[in-house]
Amino acid sequence: MVAENNKNKDVTLSASMDNNNNNIKGTNIHLEVHQKEPALVKPESETRKGLYFLSNLDQNIAVIVRTIYCFKSEERGNEEAVQVIKKALSQVLVHYYPLAGRLTISPEGKLTVDCTEEGVVFVEAEANCKMDEIGDITKPDPETLGKLVYDVVDAKNILEIPPVTAQVTKFKCGGFVLGLCMNHCMFDGIGAMEFVNSWGQVARGLPLTTPPFSDRTILNARNPPKIENLHQEFEEIEDKSNINSLYTKEPTLYRSFCFDPEKIKKLKLQATENSESLLGNSCTSFEALSAFVWRARTKSLKMLSDQKTKLLFAVDGRAKFEPQLPKGYFGNGIVLTNSICEAGELIEKPLSFAVGLVREAIKMVTDGYMRSAIDYFEVTRARPSLSSTLLITTWSRLGFHTTDFGWGEPILSGPVALPEKEVTLFLSHGEQRRSINVLLGLPATAMDVFQEQFLQI
């Protein structure tokens, strides 16, 4: 069922972009996107009402994530794209009914979802150019790519932003882009991937490969809560190096660095040198990349030697919980782990030292650690601090590239922007997706230093 929202008028958004596409290098395209009036797409049939519980792992990460998926088929134009995707959304919302609700605050003062069946905000749009004229979407570009995602511009806080908004933008070449704006409290990367892939399966008339498991109370805090770990992920670190002022004084540049299989091999070799514990042992691509980016970013920001620096990254806890989370668990099944050391030690010691810190942070994540993190939030209501921190999030193992609404898999997909300046994203890339793109934002002078270190690998 689709209900029209008459509060909004048609809108035209525009942005100039320097196009780095190899076919039209050097051209300057002025992208205009005409958005039609938003509609509300409701579940096709009646769904459960009332308040829907969000776990403490969901509470910790209520940030907006914007992504785009570019589709183009030689056999099928974009004439039916809006109709097919909108209808399939209405059908898949029967399974993912909380997405049609609205965020609110529970009597306990926590985020929860009021399952009102109000619907997902859906926008049809048209662009004034061909899809390959968008340029390089392998790096975040909120000014340009943001035109392909619908934002609730007058929202004062996340409670006024629907859990999901969708925009389908048709291009003159017959291709189209699906832009999604989703609140991370509704699902992590795996949950989001399963939702979008299920949406595509419904569009093609197929049954869901992985029906969602919706009961998040299985991750309820213990009664009484038991905090059994230090949980330095919540620690506020003093900014002795005035890093925040550097971001204020200089423009932030967003760049994508491609680590192909050969570069990853070299990095992993460097990562096991000068270490008795790692000598002769291989390390994973994630361990080597995370260690390199942490050291290189710390050096690029010219942190003082005695400045503490924190590495945060998410570990999928689905198989680590006891018992394991059910297949299709719809909420956040990730937990943040961490490592803290002084910048001087991190930079002066070999890469293998940082790899060891990453490895120890991974080993920390057990059922007990994750339950303790859930209980920590229950007692303190604290959220992880990003002060003097690098937060790495990994999409390289997620199957967003397999999404198919009937036009084949996306030719490109990726984030519109990084949610915070401290966030770095790992994305799979290239032939057989064996390369990894590292996306990050740094002040201009720091980005130059980071690039020099990348070229030295």
From Swiss-Prot:
Involved in the synthesis of aromatics of the suberin polymer. Specifically affects the accumulation of the ferulate constituent of suberin in roots and seeds, but has no effect on the content of p-coumarate or sinapate. The active site is at residues 184, 404. GO terms for molecular function: hydroxycinnamoyltransferase activity; omega-hydroxypalmitate O-sinapoyl transferase activity. Optimum temperature is 10 degrees Celsius. It comes from Arabidopsis thaliana. Belongs to the plant acyltransferase family. InterPro entries: CAT-like_dom_sf, Plant_Fungal_Acyltransferase. Its EC number is 2.3.1.188. It catalyses: 16-hydroxyhexadecanoate + (E)-feruloyl-CoA = 16-feruloyloxyhexadecanoate + CoA. This is Omega-hydroxypalmitate O-feruloyl transferase. Optimum pH is 7.5.
